Amino acid sequence: GLGDVYKRQIESYCTDTETPLVISVVPEEKAPELLLRWPRLRMNNERNWKDYLYRAEDMAAFAGRKYSGQRNHINKFRKEYPTAKFVPLTGADMPLIENFWADYEQEFQKTSFNAKRELAYAKALARLLPEGWLLGGGLLVDDRLVAMSLAENCGGTLIIHVEKALYSHQGAYPTLVQAFAAHFGGDCVYINREDDAGDRGLRTSKLQYLPVRLAGKLRFEVQCEADRLREIPTVTTPRLTLTPLEERDEAAYNALCLDDARNRWWGYDLSLIHI
């Protein structure tokens, strides 16, 4: 099929460019298919990159004792900001969103490279809202945006790419989560709030919403026979002995590399290389 054609093209490219074949963000259910194609794989399934999956109906209702904490935070937010309302966001709301980013950065206290990069990516994604394929929504308090989310509906799963709220407005996050799920998740079975990237605070928060599953995103490194060798082998023939290089071989190796006359026998001329 077409998938096999793509796999062959990828293999050819990696062979021609001497690039290691690495496949990332592979859903767990796709692993058997890759193992059939490449039986020698090194797999990585890091906890930091597992996606948090929730039932859409749970996020939209927060029903039952297990969600009493979220409901309490929402009630406090509604009491503190009685005029707050959820609104869908479109490309026409870009000025409102830009003002939100300005307010958000005033309260943003994380200094790590990853945190700053994630914020930059979130802002870049928001600029794509006018293209029409993103779902956007936010909380307005007196015509000021205090929280916003960006998502996609992919095959019955609502994937939340961005979820931001002003820290000064306590309870804004659970209020946003519930309102966004209620508005956009009606035809969805699951809501994917993506990974926590190893951030402790984010992990604690996402676990408090009681995910039904942590979905792995596998990383495969395709290997060859040579990758199975634990050490460089010693090969002996009547005329040749091949052994691993040692420190004492440095002078002889350098002399060989700089011997132009001898190197011509191997099909290359180092004198033609200009630095």
PLM segments and residue spans:
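GNAT-family acyltransferases
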Residues: G91-E105, E225-I273
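Short, small-residue-biased leader/transition segments that mark boundaries at the very start
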Residues: G1-Y6, I275
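Conserved catalytic-core motifs of GNAT/GCN5-like acyltransferases
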Residues: N44-Y52, V212-R228
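A conserved beta-strand-loop-helix scaffold within acyl/acetyltransferase catalytic domains
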Residues: K85-L166
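Short, glycine/charge-rich beta-strand/loop segments that flank catalytic centers
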Residues: P20-R37, N48-K50
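Conserved GNAT acetyl-CoA-binding A-motif
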Residues: T17-V26, G186-E194
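Acyltransferase donor/substrate-recognition loop-hinge adjacent to the catalytic core
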Residues: P39-K110
